[in-house]
Swiss-Prot record:
Record-stated family: Belongs to the TIFY/JAZ family.
Single biological process term from Gene Ontology: regulation of defense response
Chain's role: Repressor of jasmonate responses.
Tagged with keyword Nucleus: yes
Main location: nucleus
Taxonomic source organism: Oryza sativa subsp. japonica (Rice)
An example Gene Ontology CC term for this record: nucleus
Protein name: Protein TIFY 6a
Domain Tify: 196-231
Annotated Pro residues bias: 136-146
Length: 427
């Protein structure tokens, strides 16, 4: 069985004059209409609709010639498209049911009466935007909309923007029936937004003991100020650390020139001399206490002459050490370095000093007698007390030397090692 594609066989037989044999031909779908055929309506529609192809049967072409049927048929046609031929009465989807179903829009009301009155146009914009009558002319005055939409349907309203720079209103091409903004629910989020008037409030700033209140400050400006304040507070710890380092370096710079005239010693590492300040302060107080004690007063005065003669610069820095701390730092470093050069000269000088002192004590008071309380403690003993008195006189000097040992003067170490031969003298 051969099939008829595009009505080729029917056209041949119609040209031969036999159209009645194929009147009951059912083309594929089982309908009672004739075969479908391709047509390109380029004459009526124009150049713009030449791209659209429509299926029309011979019955539809014959019906187009009648203006009454064309008015009814054109009412249910799309722009540029033609519906399929009407099915037979025995079909499940008959034409009457289809026409009755198409008379209702989305909201359940008949729309053709309103469409005939209003024409579905507002501000020159058609409901479909493409099928306007001025685009596709039709012989009938009825609109060419198969499913028109009502004005009261809120789901199909689209906002129309205000006038553009050119002055012409913006046109929406699909489902635009109005440009109302207040009654529409499409495209609105959270109510109307006022971007020109943002939220403003008061801002209070506490700075330098003052309270500053500013009115009408937006939230964005307040956030920017807070961000700037947080950034400005970050680099403060490094700057404080740099400031704390500066006094140490300044003190180190001050100690070096003060130490040069005293000992003529260049301190190469001033950092090592800084921690010694706390350790040197205690020996200074010990020396001052030792000088004020009545027991060691005479011995310190006696020992001041030979010591100052041997090393004249050893006592003067100590007398000047009490007002300021950087000076004893330099003197202790100098005194710790210099005594290494003259250990033997100290030993001989100390031995001679002790011998002369013992001779003076024995010549002045060979026997015990009532003396002042300062000297009675040194001379208490039996009649043979020259050696004992000499030993007791040595002890304050040794205590004074031990006190001076804390200042970094190791000259008393040699004296303690040579104490037995120097003190025991046979008469």
């Amino acid at each position: 069985m051969e099939r008829d594609f595009l009505g080729a066989i029917w056209r041949k037989e119609e040209a031969a004059g036999k159209p009645e044999e194929h009147s009951d031909y059912r083309g594929g779908g089982g309908g009672a209409s004739a075969a479908m055929q391709w047509q390109f309506p380029a004459t009526k529609v124009g150049a713009a609709s030449s791209a659209f192809m429509s299926f029309r049967s011979s019955a539809a072409a014959a019906r187009e010639e009648d203006p009454k049927e064309a008015a009814v048929f054109d009412r249910f046609s799309l722009s540029g498209f033609r519906p399929p031929p009407r099915p037979s009465p025995g079909d499940a989807f008959d034409g009457a049911a289809a026409m009755k179903q198409r008379q209702f829009g989305f909201n359940g009301r008949q729309q053709y009466a309103a469409a005939a009155q209003h024409g579905h146009r507002e501000q020159g914009v058609d409901s479909y935007g493409v099928a306007a009558p001025h685009h596709f002319p039709s012989p009938s005055p009825s609109p060419r909309h198969p499913v028109p939409f009502g004005h009261a349907n809120p789901m199909l309203r689209v906002h129309s923007l205000p006038n553009v720079a050119g002055g012409s209103p913006y046109r929406n091409q699909s489902f635009s029936v109005g440009n109302s903004v207040a009654g529409s629910t499409v495209g609105v989020y959270g109510g109307p937004r006022d971007l020109q008037n943002p939220k403003v409030t008061q801002m209070t700033i506490f700075y330098d003991g003052l309270v500053n209140v500013f009115d009408n400050i937006p939230v964005e400006k307040a956030q920017e100020l807070m961000l700037l304040a947080s950034r400005a507070s970050i680099p403060s710890p490094p700057s404080a650390a740099r400031k704390s380092d500066s006094p140490i370096s300044a003190a180190a710079k001050l100690t070096v020139p003060e130490a040069l005239p005293a000992r003529q010693i260049v301190v190469q590492k001033p950092e090592a001399s800084v921690p010694l300040v706390s350790g040197v302060s205690n020996p200074i107080t010990i020396v001052s206490q030792a000088v004020t004690l009545p027991k060691s007063f005479s011995s310190s005065n006696d020992s001041a002459g030979p010591k100052s003669g041997g090393l004249p610069l050893a006592v003067t820095p100590l007398s000047q050490a009490s007002p300021s701390q950087p000076i004893p730092v330099a003197t202790t470093n100098a005194s710790a370095i210099m005594p290494r050069a003259v250990p033997q000269a100290r030993k001989a000088s100390l031995a001679r000093f002790l011998e002369k002192r013992k001779e003076r004590v024995s010549s002045v008071a060979p026997y015990p007698s009532s003396k002042s309380p300062l000297e009675s403690s040194d001379t208490i003993g039996s009649p043979s007390t020259p050696s004992k008195s000499s030993c007791t006189d040595i002890t304050p000097s040794t205590n004074n030397c031990e006190d001076s040992l804390c200042l970094g003067q190791p000259r008393n170490i040699s004296f303690s090692s040579q104490e037995p031969p120097s003190t025991k003298l046979q008469i």
